[in-house]
Every structure is written in structure tokens, then in C-alpha cells.
């Protein structure tokens, strides 16, 4: 492991949940930004434009 000595400074019982939690929060924030700041993504998730019959 390249950065293996980090666990001598930070306890893994604290560091791993912080790392995984920060990754999850970042992913949720990116998805929220895509949903709220684009027009194509909500249309894509709703199936696009409906064609007249």
C-alpha cells in the first residue's frame, strides 16, 4: 500500500468511516447537482418527450 503509514496517525476505526462517508456524500452531491442544474437528465429519467399519436 502506497500510503500505509497513514494508519499510524489515524485509527482505521475512525479513518475508514470518514473516508467512505466523504466519498458517499460527494457522490450524492454530484448527482444532486446534475439533477438540479441540467434540463436533459430529468427528461431522460422520465422517458423523454412523448410523441403525439
UniProtKB/Swiss-Prot annotation:
Belongs to the antenna complex alpha subunit family. One of its GO terms (molecular function) is bacteriochlorophyll binding. It comes from Rhodoblastus acidophilus. Its main location: membrane. A bacteriochlorophyll binds at residue 31. This is Light-harvesting protein B-800/820 alpha chain. Gene3D superfamilies: Light-harvesting complex. GO terms for cellular component: organelle inner membrane; plasma membrane; plasma membrane light-harvesting complex.
